[in-house]
């Protein structure tokens, strides 16, 4: 990088530019239990040594700047600086390496994902000395976790609210995502819930557009779910999207949902922002609302392997900020999601203590110290033939969400919901009897279809539908 060009200054310090590694590369440093630890995938510009690039990441995401400043003498740099304490090669990649950086906890505001990300994934990602930079994982120390409320309710409380146990929950996104009137939208909600689904969902695009204003949608959807509850004897929900252009409008929608007595609202947490999300999560806990989270815009940030931020980091951030559900990919559907990587961040969402496991992309052991868990939502291009794989991959503590796989049924919405509920119950029963869902899945579905004409029709429609493309973001070859 820049050569050392120090000159004497009359104020008693050496002005100029010096290599970052002199201050911020500390291979002998032993990280503290209270440090936030980060694993960065670094691709430096040609000629930039790994140690200098790693130190630059630590500096520019903590206390450093491009030149020596006299106010450095007014603080304790050793107390507040980030430290690159380890450099690790990436198998099969000569131009990349993993830089491990430790950040003192005092650098971050308590209970603020916004502040944490502003430092760790801020201006450093535009640093010219780096060709690319990706945040692969974070270790959030117990001391910082305890400053967050986390999910409004968590997995067990949600099951108790819904009185549903021993199986994944079933959902459906109402389609077409845009253009329906509020009354027709409510009709679709009613038909899906009556047919056996636990939830229906606003699409992430649905806020308050001219064809369907939010208040009208909320009213018709509430009417639909209460009618379906009365007919089925089951508790039902519809994810009413409270996302809005301002936090004030978002909260107005959440308050109206609470007044209607519905069980759950929804937020687009990346486009809406972490400050808005945490605000809404606190309201939901205080007022008994579940909170469904959509991750719209995540792939802009996390899909490319050498630059951006891995979704496991966004998942950890969401658990801290607050949400009871979050979309997590399907492994088998139309959206990006390699199996081992997906299972890794599903563990980070649901479990209380997760060991380091590089085979699943987990760089650090994470202790959530009883912060409530988040239900992963599998959604996007899935249908009844995927049910055995989804049940086997995600287990009971998940939401399986079939949009086109419900509303695309040749007989209508309610039969589409029936087909999915029958397929799910068949898979859960087969699993409980000790059958191998991965090996016998298709046979289990065929057997169930003999007793359900709705399922048989769905099986016929989607028997040839597959999404067989290789994932872009895959684990490094060791």
From Swiss-Prot:
Pfam families: RuBisCO_large, RuBisCO_large_N
Catalytic residues, chain numbering: 175 (proton acceptor), 294 (proton acceptor)
PTM-bearing positions, type N6,N6,N6-trimethyllysine: 14
GO biological process, one term: photorespiration
Site positions (Transition state stabilizer): 334
Job of this protein: RuBisCO catalyzes two reactions: the carboxylation of D-ribulose 1,5-bisphosphate, the primary event in carbon dioxide fixation, as well as the oxidative fragmentation of the pentose substrate in the photorespiration process. Both reactions occur simultaneously and in competition at the same active site.
Main location: plastid
Protein name as annotated: Ribulose bisphosphate carboxylase large chain
Record's subcellular location: Plastid, Chloroplast
Family that this chain belongs to: Belongs to the RuBisCO large chain family. Type I subfamily.
PROSITE patterns for this protein: RUBISCO_LARGE
Modification N6-carboxylysine occurs at: 201
Residues holding substrate: 123, 173, 177, 295, 327, 379
Organismal lineage: Eukaryota, Viridiplantae, Streptophyta, Embryophyta, Tracheophyta
GO cellular component, one term: chloroplast
GO molecular function, one term: monooxygenase activity
Keywords, ordered alphabetically: Acetylation, Calvin cycle, Carbon dioxide fixation, Chloroplast, Disulfide bond, Lyase, Magnesium, Metal-binding, Methylation, Monooxygenase, Oxidoreductase, Photorespiration, Photosynthesis, Plastid
Gene encoding the protein: rbcL
Modified residues (N-acetylproline): 3
Origin: domain of life: Eukaryota
Catalytic activity, reaction form: 2 (2R)-3-phosphoglycerate + 2 H(+) = D-ribulose 1,5-bisphosphate + CO2 + H2O; D-ribulose 1,5-bisphosphate + O2 = 2-phosphoglycolate + (2R)-3-phosphoglycerate + 2 H(+)
E.C. number: 4.1.1.39
Prodomain residues: 1-2
Organism of derivation: Panax ginseng (Korean ginseng)
Gene3D superfamilies per UniProt: Ribulose bisphosphate carboxylase, large subunit, C-terminal domain, RuBisCO large subunit, N-terminal domain
Cofactor section: Mg(2+)
Post-translational modification: The disulfide bond which can form in the large chain dimeric partners within the hexadecamer appears to be associated with oxidative stress and protein turnover.
């Amino acid at each position: 990088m820049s050569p050392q060009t120090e000159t004497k200054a009359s104020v008693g310090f050496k002005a100029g530019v010096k290599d970052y590694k002199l201050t911020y590369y500390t291979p002998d440093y032993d990280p503290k239990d209270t440090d936030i630890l980060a694993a960065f995938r670094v691709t430096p510009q040609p000629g930039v040594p790994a140690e200098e690039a790693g130190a630059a990441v630590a500096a520019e995401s903590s206390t450093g700047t491009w030149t020596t400043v006299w106010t450095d003498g007014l603080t304790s740099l050793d107390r507040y600086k980030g430290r690159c304490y380890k450099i690790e090669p990436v198998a099969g990649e000569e131009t990349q390496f993993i830089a491990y950086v430790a950040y003192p906890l005092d650098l971050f505001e308590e209970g603020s994902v916004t502040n944490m990300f502003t430092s760790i994934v801020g201006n450093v990602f535009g640093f010219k000395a780096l060709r690319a930079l990706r945040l692969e994982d974070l270790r959030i120390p117990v001391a910082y976790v305890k400053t967050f409320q986390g999910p409004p309710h968590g997995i067990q409380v949600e099951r108790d609210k819904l009185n549903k146990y021993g199986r994944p929950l079933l959902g459906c996104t109402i389609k077409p995502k845009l253009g329906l009137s509020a009354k027709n939208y409510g009709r679709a909600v009613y038909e899906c819930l009556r047919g056996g689904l636990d939830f229906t969902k606003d699409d992430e695009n649905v806020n308050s557009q001219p064809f369907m204003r939010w208040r009208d949608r909320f009213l018709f959807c509430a009417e639909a779910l209460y009618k379906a509850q009365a007919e089925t004897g089951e508790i039902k929900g519809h994810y009413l999207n409270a996302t809005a252009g301002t936090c004030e409008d978002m909260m107005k929608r959440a308050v109206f949902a609470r007044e209607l007595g519905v069980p759950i609202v929804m937020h687009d947490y990346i486009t809406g922002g972490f400050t808005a999300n945490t605000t809404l999560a606190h309201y939901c806990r205080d007022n008994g609302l579940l909170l469904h989270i959509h991750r719209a815009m995540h792939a802009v940030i996390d899909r490319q392997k050498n630059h951006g931020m891995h979704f496991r980091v966004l998942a950890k951030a969401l658990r801290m900020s607050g949400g009871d559900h979050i979309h997590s990919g399907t492994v088998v559907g139309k959206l990006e999601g390699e199996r081992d990587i997906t299972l890794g961040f599903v563990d980070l969402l649901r479990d209380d203590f997760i060991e380091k496991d590089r085979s699943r992309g987990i760089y650090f052991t994470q202790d959530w110290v009883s912060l409530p868990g988040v239900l992963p939502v599998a959604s996007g291009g899935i249908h009844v033939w995927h049910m055995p794989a989804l049940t086997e991959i995600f287990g009971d503590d998940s939401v399986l969400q079939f949009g086109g796989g419900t509303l695309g049924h040749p007989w209508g919405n309610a039969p589409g919901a029936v087909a999915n509920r029958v397929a799910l119950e068949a898979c859960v029963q087969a699993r409980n009897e000790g059958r191998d869902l991965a090996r016998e899945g298709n046979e289990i579905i065929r057997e169930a279809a003999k007793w359900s004409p709705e399922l048989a029709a769905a099986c016929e429609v989607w028997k040839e539908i597959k999404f067989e493309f290789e994932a872009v973001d895959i684990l490094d070859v060791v």
